[in-house]
Amino acid sequence: ASDVYKRQNGALLAKKISKELDLISDKNIIFCSMKINKSNPTENIQLSIDINECKNQSVVIVDDVLNSGKTLAYAVKHFLDIEIESIKTAVLVNRSHKKFPISADFKGINLSSSLQNHVDVVFMKDKIEAFLF
């Protein structure tokens, strides 16, 4: 896989959230990973399931860090091609540098930082840590 597809922290976070929801909800939770080329987000977006499985369903799009909003905006746009019940967005770290008109419905933490800062999210067996540098 090319460098633009390697990081899958959003999928790891979504998997953890879907497992937790399975424990507390009687709803049928379907996990789906999505691959978006960050340098060319209009290029072939890949889903791990057929998009039609999401038809007339509620969709939650999960990412680890919301920076400019570009990735999340293109992820939401992808699901607008089918009829769905609702779309919500969830992020672990919400930064305030958005260039796109998108926001997270569910946020782990709001982080004010400069554009020069970088947030790295590390997934371990028992915990998830976010580092600002």
Label the model's feature ranges.
Residues 77-133:
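PRPP-dependent phosphoribosyltransferase catalytic core
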Residues 13-15, 71-72, 99-101:
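Short glycine-/acidic-enriched loop or helix-start segments at secondary-structure transitions
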Residues 7-13:
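Glycine-rich phosphate-binding loops at beta-strand->alpha-helix junctions
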Residues 10, 49, 61-62:
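Structured catalytic core of nucleotide-sugar glycosyltransferases
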Residues 57-86:
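Internal catalytic or translocation cores that form aromatic/hydrophobic pockets or channels
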Residues 6, 36, 92-94:
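Cofactor-binding loop segments of dinucleotide-utilizing enzymes, especially the Rossmann-like FAD-
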Residues 1-5:
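Short, small-residue-biased leader/transition segments that mark boundaries at the very start
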Residues 15, 19-58, 70:
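Short, glycine/charge-rich flexible loops or terminal/linker lids adjacent to PRPP-binding catalytic cores
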